[in-house]
């Protein structure tokens, strides 16, 4: 019997490769099942101790050309890839990552659709101060042919305990009354579970501020409230953490969630925060939930709103949030980053959301 030639040996290798691949695929199916079971039990996916046990057992097997070192190298690579498979399975199991979670028409808030293909403006003062102030802003917003939600804070979580904290229920009432007069839907922040029913009674969309992104009890309660939620990214949060916060809401029954990039904290001081523009397309790849950008809090300055707004829309943002005040220099909170009414008109014109008078 003649010795096998190179072609035959290579054919044998090809068969073995396919057999190994089949067994690796079989192993991967078991790995995914383990990952799902661990997730259901609240256990960490990665178990270094279990890996070491398997390596010890494998090193005791009779070997040929593969010694203990080679076996360790091969199986450590398999473990590393398997961990990636488990992590992908964990992520894919999240409701926020499921395709078709949001209808093609977007999330309806009043007569506005967020994520429906047309950028929406979330505009209004940082804080509701009085009826006259809010009326001037709302009346101006209503004159512009741009899909708009009226934002305004009634409960203000301030860094300084001596700063203006908001008008609370009176502010909610003013916001609702003013919005109704001008056929606008409202967005305002809810701070905790205790005030959630009150805020939900008055407002069309409930905002979770950056400070509350990790407030799991509030997130779970918002999942049961039945109203659209605007979820802001905390300034130190990863995008994965933002999606997991959204998962708390969605997994509790409310898939009407809009994500908001509002800037992250870095060493840079030229802006109030650092606008993570890459967050927009990444989130759009990871989830079907709409994504907007809060320009005012990300930048903390008025002079670069237009170019950054253009960048956000070009990146795929479904809307922009901008703080607008009739007299920013007299504002009771964050006056330095709010823009006046003519500046707001110029902004939406510059963004191409509405044509300036006299232009074709």
Regions found by a protein language model. Name each.
Residues 1-98:
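Domain-level signature for soluble enzymes in the chorismate/prephenate branch of the shikimate pathway
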Residues 34-43, 151-169, 326-336:
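Glycine-rich, proline-tolerant flexible connector loops at the mouths of alpha/beta enzymes
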Residues 44-58, 165-188, 222-228, 277-292, ...:
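Alpha-helix-loop-beta-strand connector modules within alpha/beta enzyme cores
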Residues 88-122, 356-360:
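N-terminal amphipathic alpha-helix/helix-capping segment at the start of soluble metabolic enzymes
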Residues 119-125, 148-152, 186-189, 206-208, ...:
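Hydrophobic faces of well-ordered beta-strands that scaffold small-molecule active sites
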Residues 146, 198-207, 223-229, 250-256, ...:
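Glycine-enriched alpha-helix->loop->beta-strand junction motifs that scaffold or abut catalytic
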Residues 152, 156-203, 207, 215-218:
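N-terminal active-site wall of soluble small-molecule enzyme domains
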Residues 156-158, 212-278:
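Conserved anion-binding
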């Amino acid at each position: 019997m003649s010795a096998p030639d190179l072609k035959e040996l290579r054919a044998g290798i090809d068969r073995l490769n396919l057999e190994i691949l089949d067994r690796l695929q079989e192993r991967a199916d078991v790995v995914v099942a383990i990952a799902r079971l661990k997730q259901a039990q609240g256990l960490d996916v990665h178990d270094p101790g279990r890996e070491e046990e398997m390596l010890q057992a494998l090193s005791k097997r009779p070997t040929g050309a593969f010694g203990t070192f080679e076996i360790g190298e091969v199986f450590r690579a398999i473990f590393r890839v398997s961990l990636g498979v488990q992590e992908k399975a964990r992520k894919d199991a999240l409701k926020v990552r499921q395709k078709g979670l949001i209808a093609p028409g977007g999330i309806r808030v009043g007569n506005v659709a967020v994520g429906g293909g047309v950028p929406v403006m979330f505009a209004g003062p940082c804080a509701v101060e009085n009826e006259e102030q809010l009326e001037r802003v709302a009346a101006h917003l209503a004159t512009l042919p741009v899909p708009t939600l009226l934002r305004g804070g009634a409960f203000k979580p301030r860094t300084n305990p001596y700063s203006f904290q908001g008008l609370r229920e009176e502010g909610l009432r003013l916001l609702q009354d003013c919005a109704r007069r001008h056929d606008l839907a409202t967005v305002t922040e809810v701070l905790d579970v205790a005030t959630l029913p009150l805020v939900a009674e008055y407002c069309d969309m409930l905002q979770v501020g950056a400070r509350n992104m990790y407030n799991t009890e509030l997130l779970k309660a918002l999942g049961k409230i039945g109203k659209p939620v605007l979820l802001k990214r905390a300034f130190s949060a990863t995008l994965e953490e933002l999606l997991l916060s959204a998962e708390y809401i969605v997994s509790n029954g409310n898939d009407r969630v809009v994500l908001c990039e509002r800037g992250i904290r870095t060493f840079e001081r030229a802006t109030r925060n650092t606008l993570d523009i890459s967050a927009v397309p990444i989130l759009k790849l990871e989830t079907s939930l709409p994504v907007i950008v809060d320009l005012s809090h990300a930048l903390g300055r008025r002079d670069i709103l237009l170019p950054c707004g253009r960048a956000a829309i070009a990146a795929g943002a479904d809307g922009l949030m901008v703080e607008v005040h009739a007299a920013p220099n007299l504002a009771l909170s964050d006056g330095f980053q709010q823009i006046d009414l003519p500046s707001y008109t110029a902004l939406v014109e510059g963004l191409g959301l509405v044509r300036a008078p006299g232009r074709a």
